[in-house]
Swiss-Prot record:
Organism of provenance: Kluyveromyces lactis (strain ATCC 8585 / CBS 2359 / DSM 70799 / NBRC 1267 / NRRL Y-1140 / WM37) (Yeast)
Organism classification: Eukaryota, Fungi, Dikarya, Ascomycota, Saccharomycotina
Name of the molecule in the record: Cytochrome c oxidase subunit 9, mitochondrial
Protein's cellular compartments: Mitochondrion inner membrane
CDD domains the UniProt entry points to: CcO_VIIa_fungal
GO biological process terms on file: mitochondrial electron transport, cytochrome c to oxygen
General function of this protein: Component of the cytochrome c oxidase, the last enzyme in the mitochondrial electron transport chain which drives oxidative phosphorylation. The respiratory chain contains 3 multisubunit complexes succinate dehydrogenase (complex II, CII), ubiquinol-cytochrome c oxidoreductase (cytochrome b-c1 complex, complex III, CIII) and cytochrome c oxidase (complex IV, CIV), that cooperate to transfer electrons derived from NADH and succinate to molecular oxygen, creating an electrochemical gradient over the inner membrane that drives transmembrane transport and the ATP synthase.
Amino acid sequence: MSAIAPITGTIRKRILADITIGFAIGGAMASYWWWGFHKNIINKREAYYAKLAEQKAAEN
């Protein structure tokens, strides 16, 4: 018997944990960017162009 435990499955478990945590954090950050930042910018742009089209229609 050796005094040190074998490291056979530890690396595999650690790699799977790192990949899972990475995807979870990446998904959370991507969701925050999409719903918290990107959608607000797009809504402002769409409102601007709708207002511009309304003004153009009022001129004609």
